From Swiss-Prot:
PSII is composed of 1 copy each of membrane proteins PsbA, PsbB, PsbC, PsbD, PsbE, PsbF, PsbH, PsbI, PsbJ, PsbK, PsbL, PsbM, PsbT, PsbX, PsbY, PsbZ, Psb30/Ycf12, peripheral proteins PsbO, CyanoQ (PsbQ), PsbU, PsbV and a large number of cofactors. It forms dimeric complexes. It comes from Nostoc punctiforme (strain ATCC 29133 / PCC 73102). Keywords: Membrane, Photosynthesis, Photosystem II, Thylakoid, Transmembrane, Transmembrane helix. Gene3D superfamilies: Single helix bin (1.20.5.510). GO terms for biological process: photosynthesis. The lineage of its organism: Bacteria, Bacillati, Cyanobacteriota, Cyanophyceae, Nostocales. The gene is psbX. This is Photosystem II reaction center protein X. Belongs to the PsbX family. Type 1 subfamily. Involved in the binding and/or turnover of quinones at the Q(B) site of photosystem II (PSII). PSII is a light-driven water plastoquinone oxidoreductase, using light energy to abstract electrons from H(2)O, generating a proton gradient subsequently used for ATP formation. It is a single-pass membrane protein. It comes from the Bacteria.
Amino acid sequence: MTPSLANFLWSLLWGTAIVVIPVTVGLIFISQKDKIQRS
């Protein structure tokens, strides 16, 4: 695997992580908050 290809794959991985992790945390936070408001 060439270094440029490795860098490209790493940047894709980090890009995905940077987008997915906050979204997941946000959804969990919102669902927890909704549960508290409903009960």
